[in-house]
Structures are given as C-alpha cells and as structure tokens.
Amino acid sequence: MYKGILLLLSAEFCFTLSTVFGKFAMADEGMTGIEVSFFRFFLGAIAAAAYMLWKRVSFRPNNITYVALRGVSNTAAVLLFFTGVQHSTVTNANMLNLTYPVFVFLLAPFINRERSRGRYFIFLLLALAGVYLIILPDFSSVNPGDLCALLSGLVAGFAICFLREARKFDSSEVILFYLMLPGCLINLMVMAPGFSIPSGTGLAYSLCSGAIAVAGQALLTVGYRYIEAARGSIVSGSRILFAGIMGVSIFSDPLTLQIVLGGALILVSLVGVSGIARKFFPPNGM
C-alpha cells in the first residue's frame, strides 16, 4: 500500500507542477490554456502509441462507444481546466478541479447504475460550500477562470464514469491512447485559426508541462495497482496542498482564510465520498 501512496503522491505532484509550467507559458509567452494543453495530448498520444507497439497491444477497441465518450469528455475537462489556469490561479484551479469525485457520486447512478448512499449528500453540500468560498472569496464577484475550473471538475466526473464502463471492455492502454488522440484532434480544430508553433521559452514551458503531465498519468496508472480506489482518492486530494504551496510560493497566489476553508471543505468531501469514513464510522456501530 505504501508503494501505491508514494506513486500517487508523485503523480499529483507532477500534475500540479505541470500546471505551473503551463502557467509560465501563459503568463510569460501569452499562450492560451488550449494551446498549452495540446502538448499534453500530443506527447501523451506518442507515448501511449509507442508503449502499445512495444507491448504489441491491438489498437482496436472492443467497445468504441465508451472509449470515445471517455476520450471526448476527458478532452473537454482538460481544456476547461487549463482555461481555468489561464484566467484564475494555480491554487484555485486545482482545488476546484478536485471536486470531480463528488460529481462522480452524483452521476454514477445514471451512467454506471451504481447506488449512491443518501448520506453522501452531506459531503456534496460541504463541497458546494467549499466551492462557494473559493469562487467568491470576497463575496462580490466571480472569476470566469474559477467557473471554468469548476466545470472541468463536473466534466471530469462524466469522464470517470465513462472510464468505469470502458474498463469493462478494454485495456488501460487502449483507453489511454484513445484519450490522447481525440485530445490532439479536438485541440487542433479549436486552435487552428490562429495557432502558430511557439518558440523559445514558450515551447520549452509547453513541452515541460506536457511531459510532466504524461509522467503523472503513468505514475497514477501504476499507483492504483497497489492501493484501493477509496484510499487512492484521498491521496489524490494532496494536490490541493501541492497547488497551495506552489501557487503561493511561485506566483504569489492570494491565499485568504476563505480560500483555505474552501479547500479544507472540498478535502473533507473527498474523504467522505471515497468511503473511507464508513470504515472508521460504520453505520451499525463497531
């Protein structure tokens, strides 16, 4: 289990660091979030294809519907997330994106036909309270970037539910490849009118952001082999801490009491919906 925890912590550190390099490309070189995310999908598609060729894994999916839904929904989530990073802060974007397990809990009964416990609505309310504190830290205005980051969490909830269904028919390698390939194509279509290949530091930052995110995805995939999903979702919440530290120390992100409380409430909701709480507080007592 400790190996799984270490791998997942490393994965979440990579995902946060990826957003830092992406923010550098946006702030210093004027790139958009969509342009930065293209390199993540591009490098990921190359890495996934190379691995499948090396392992001689067939590129033909068994259930194209769920594989495609997973790929398209994940692409939309990533585009929204990096748009959030562009217009908001690294801290806020990561915190709001991490609401996705709560949306999985809401969507699972409809997509996966899994029952959701009624008591989990308490954790939903906690998450919504946390979102409110982050999006409205001064209780006056809403940052469009924060809304994009929150929407990325909602769409990621759909993506996770589709992933659960896709795994019933296809391997992780096939799902990952068809996650990255649509991302490349959709990104190209969205940014084609005015896109030009960046040069210098813009290209370096984008490549670093993409490569580190791909490394994080690999660590995440391997890590879940050594830890159960419920515990893993709690470890994934460490990205809130990483984002807060990096955002404040590197970009001087504002970290008000309201934002800290909002992040804490979201983290508590992650603990709740993961099912960990049931192990320590069973409904029928000890």
Regions found by a protein language model. Name each.
Residues 29-76, 155-159, 178-193:
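Transmembrane alpha-helices of multi-pass small-molecule transport proteins
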Residues 237-286:
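C-terminal-most transmembrane helix of multi-pass membrane proteins
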Residues 43-47, 96-110, 125-126, 182-186, ...:
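Alpha-helical transmembrane segments of compact multi-pass small-molecule transporters, enriched
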Residues 4-11, 56-80, 143-154, 191, ...:
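Loop-to-transmembrane-helix transition segments
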Residues 93-99, 166-182, 217-249:
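Helix-helix packing/entry segments at the starts of transmembrane helices
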Residues 1-35, 140-165, 285-286:
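Glycine-/small-residue-enriched transmembrane alpha-helix faces in small-molecule transporters
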